[in-house]
C-alpha cells in the first residue's frame, strides 16, 4: 500500500511506499517510526534553488544518483530533512491512501 503526501507550502508531491518489515522487532515500532521510501519527482525538484538542490545531493548516504531521489528514513527524520533542504519549514499537510501494486 502506498501513501501520497502533499507538502502544501512548497507544492512538492512526494510518494511514500511502505517497505516490508525486515525484522520482527520492527512490528512493535510506532507507525511514524516505520521506514518509508520517499520519491521526489523531477518536476518538483526543479522548483528548488540550485543551492538547496546541492544540499540535497550532499546526502550521498541517502540519495542515489539521478531521478527520482530516494530517501530511506523514518517519517519524522524525513520531515526534518525536508525542512532543512527546502526553503523554510516543511509541513506534511495531507495523507491519503492510494492503490498500489507494490
Swiss-Prot record:
It comes from the Eukaryota. A motif (RxLR-dEER) lies at residues 51-60. One of its GO terms (cellular component) is host cell nucleus. Disulfide bonds: none annotated. Its main location: secreted. It is found in: Secreted; Host chloroplast envelope; Host cytoplasm; Host nucleus. Effector that partially suppresses the tobacco programmed cell death induced by cell death-inducing proteins. This is Secreted RxLR effector protein 61. It comes from Plasmopara viticola.
Amino acid at each position: 500500500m502506498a501513501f501520497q503526501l502533499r507538502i502544501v507550502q512548497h507544492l512538492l508531491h512526494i510518494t511514500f511506499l511502505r517497505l516490508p518489515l525486515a525484522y520482527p522487532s520492527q512490528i512493535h515500532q510506532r507507525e511514524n517510526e516505520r521506514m518509508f521510501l520517499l520519491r521526489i519527482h523531477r518536476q518538483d525538484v526543479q522548483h528548488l534553488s540550485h543551492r538547496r538542490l546541492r544540499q540535497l545531493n550532499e546526502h550521498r548516504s541517502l540519495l542515489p544518483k539521478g531521478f527520482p531521489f530516494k530517501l530511506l528514513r523514518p517519517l519524522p527524520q524525513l520531515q526534518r530533512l525536508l525542512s532543512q533542504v527546502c526553503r523554510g519549514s516543511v509541513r506534511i499537510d495531507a495523507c491519503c491512501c492510494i492503490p498500489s501494486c507494490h
